[in-house]
Amino acid sequence: MSIMSYTGGTVVAMAGDECVCIASDLRIGEQMTTIATDQKKVHKVTDKVYVGLAGFQSDARTVLEKIMFRKNLYELRENRNIKPQVLSEMISNLAYQHRFGSYFTEPLVAGLDDTNKPYICCMDTIGCVSAPRDFVAVGTGQEYLLGVCENFWRENMKPDELFEATAQSILSCLERDAASGWGAVVYTITKDKVNVSTIKARMD
């Protein structure tokens, strides 16, 4: 078994009309043994920018600490909130610096910029960025998510529609991926607020 799928976990993000959704499952395991059922893989960076970390969760915790350190340093120097595009480049540089002994985690960035334009991207373990305009997914359930997201995603979806599409996509993934599960948490980021919803799913 690959170290990338050792602890399991899936993160997905979708872009809408001045809104984005990012969701993850809640399971952390040791291969097929479930260790905990409340492991959130999505973390707040600013009020409008969130990062999801799939892969080996020990490395994900280390990467998160480094991301927050660099983000705080950036905001002290620049005296402004970090944009999602800048954060993705920062994480990409961090990953590429460690390419010869890379962190076993796949980061995903989702958020709104200063004009409330949605931005989503994901990257591999050495920081190669993929930034489509529709949806991204990382983790053990990625192969199950992409086709489902293709079916649910529409252009210019409003927050309620986007939440429904993201929630249905991750629930469909949790039905099929044995390394993810025990419910999901969905963050809907709009220009005014962030809604956090916890969804029940299969408990096996």
Curated annotation (Swiss-Prot):
SUPFAM superfamilies: N-terminal nucleophile aminohydrolases (Ntn hydrolases) (SSF56235). CDD domains: proteasome_beta_type_3. GO terms for biological process: proteasome-mediated ubiquitin-dependent protein catabolic process. The keyword Membrane does not apply. Its main location: cytoplasm. Non-catalytic component of the proteasome, a multicatalytic proteinase complex which is characterized by its ability to cleave peptides with Arg, Phe, Tyr, Leu, and Glu adjacent to the leaving group at neutral or slightly basic pH. The proteasome has an ATP-dependent proteolytic activity. Belongs to the peptidase T1B family. The 26S proteasome consists of a 20S proteasome core and two 19S regulatory subunits. The 20S proteasome core is composed of 28 subunits that are arranged in four stacked rings, resulting in a barrel-shaped structure. The two end rings are each formed by seven alpha subunits, and the two central rings are each formed by seven beta subunits. The catalytic chamber with the active sites is on the inside of the barrel. This is Proteasome subunit beta type-3. It comes from Caenorhabditis elegans.
